[in-house]
Design a protein with these regions (language model features):
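Enzyme catalytic cores with a strong preference for nitrogen-chemistry domains
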Residues: 1-301
Length: 301
């Protein structure tokens, strides 16, 4: 009998504000994780239920009820699998950027993001209250720590997981693209793994949302600071990783993906951003102005 713990990182494209549609996608992938992969756990990205960034939608009167109804449905689907879902969570009139951990139709753990970014495209301190508690939960005999996005960019949250007994850390993210962002993510995670001697499973959102594009590129870094598996650029993917409980070692279920060059990355990100901007806004078509230059030729293709 295998002593592997099978964990899926769900790199998916969610739609801001479509809570019911995002819930449906989560449920479909929970079933896939159980039926096709025999997974013990599936982790979805930061604020997957509402899409990221929800901005002022978070203040709407009915948002709490819609979130709780969807979480109730996901709870019902959590028999025999642990489901980690990023969602806003409202408690005692405070709003948190949360990760809920569900198994066997119960919420077994909650984590509230500690480090709320408030620069550039981020305005999380306007919407959320920072969490203060560390979350380490038991998954089939393995102690798992949780962080959310910005938490891994600073000293503190990962080391607090280590000090609370975590054997590995799952980081759920909605980290938007810029030209050197993926290298920055890897460098940041490398420092956390190096300093805390914990492997980190990093799952990122994919898809365009207005001016932001999330490039995916989820990855797993083992305790020796090797990237053992990496998801694709700009594509939805369920990334499967196995943790050998006896050897305390991680293994990817497929090789590290093809590494596109810089121009290919930029092209794919622009393509995804434009496609999702059109589709998510329900546009039936568009008008393309062509001047005859190389920029117009690229737009036309």
């Amino acid at each position: 009998m295998s002593n592997d713990l099978n964990i899926i990182l769900a790199q998916l494209n969610f739609h801001v504000g479509d809570i019911e549609g995002n819930c449906k996608k989560i449920l479909e992938n929970v079933e896939l994780a159980k039926s096709m992969y025999a997974a013990d756990c599936i982790a979805f990205t930061e604020l997957a239920l509402t899409g990221y960034p929800p901005e002022d939608l978070i203040f709407r009167a009915k948002i709490k009820d819609r979130i709780e109804k969807s979480i109730s449905k996901i709870l019902q689907a959590s028999m025999d699998i642990t489901v980690i879902v990023g969602t806003p969570w409202i408690e005692n009139d405070s709003r948190f950027n949360a990760a809920l951990v569900m198994r066997d139709q119960k919420i077994i753990a909650k984590y509230y993001k500690k480090i709320l970014p408030n620069y550039g495209e981020f305005d999380e301190q306007r919407y959320f209250t920072a969490g203060t508690e560390t979350c380490v939960f038991n998954l089939c005999g393995v102690s798992i720590g949780l962080t959310i996005c910005e938490d891994v960019w600073v000293n503190g949250p990962v080391s607090q997981c280590r000090d609370s007994g975590a054997e590995l850390v799952i980081s759920i993210n909605a980290s938007p693209f810029h030209q050197y962002k993926h290298k920055e993510r890897i460098d940041v995670v490398w420092k956390q793994v190096s300093g805390n001697h914990l492997p980190i499973l990093y799952v990122n959102q994919v898809g365009g949302q207005d001016e932001l594009v999330f490039d995916g590129y989820s990855f797993v870094m083992d305790v020796d600071k090797n990237i053992i598996v990496e998801a694709s650029l700009c594509e939805e993917e369920l990334l499967l990783v196995a943790y050998d409980k006896d050897r305390q070692a991680l293994a990817g279920k497929r090789p590290v993906s093809h590494k596109p060059d810089r121009l290919e990355v930029i092209y794919q990100v622009l393509l995804l951003g434009l496609k999702d901007y059109v589709n998510k806004n329900g546009f039936a078509g568009g008008l393309v102005g062509l001047s005859g230059g190389i920029d117009s030729a690229l737009v036309l293709t």
